[in-house]
Amino acid sequence: CSQSRGLGDVYKRQTIDKIVDAIFQIQGGYSLVMLTQNSLVGVRDPFGIRPLVIGKLKNSYVMTSETCALDIIGAKFIREVENGEIVLIENDELKSIKPFPQKKVRPCVFEYIYFARPDSILDGKTAYEHRKNLGVELAKENDVNADIVVPVPDSGNAAALGFAQHLGMNFELGLVRNHYVGRTFIEPSQKIRSCLLYTSDAADERN
């Protein structure tokens, strides 16, 4: 029994060492989740550019990039994986490994304004709250004279609402988004992006 436990410890160290060796060669933002034969491993880049969270479903741990995924399966949010942290979960035990020198967290702003689902939690607030607050801050900097505020859906809805409420303006949904069109900005050519732009949003002429 002690011999098998010793071999297991060696295997565990070798697995983590290989992961550390690999991620030391990577520059940029990433969050990784890996399954080995006996463990669940999560890794977040040293700057925390991409999000990664830990949840618990009954007696088992789960990992995902957004807290909304935990809500869907009924899992309880435990915490965020810290920047530069490797989380090893084995036999329902969680171990934290931090092989990188400590760096200042620099999350991707697109997570806050675009990528994250509105109900996902980022730094203690929902993405919806972050976006609405951005609209409020924009209103403080730009005292405009307008009749209505119209968002570009869907990610702009919360920011436009915050902007309108702060300035006491009417908020109207003047654009209708086609939800069957994907994200246009990640398409490889300007021609495709321009084509999809015409099918992505349409003006609601009745308002």
Residue spans for each PLM region:
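Glycine-centered structural positions embedded in regular secondary structure
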Residues: 55, 131, 135, 162, ...
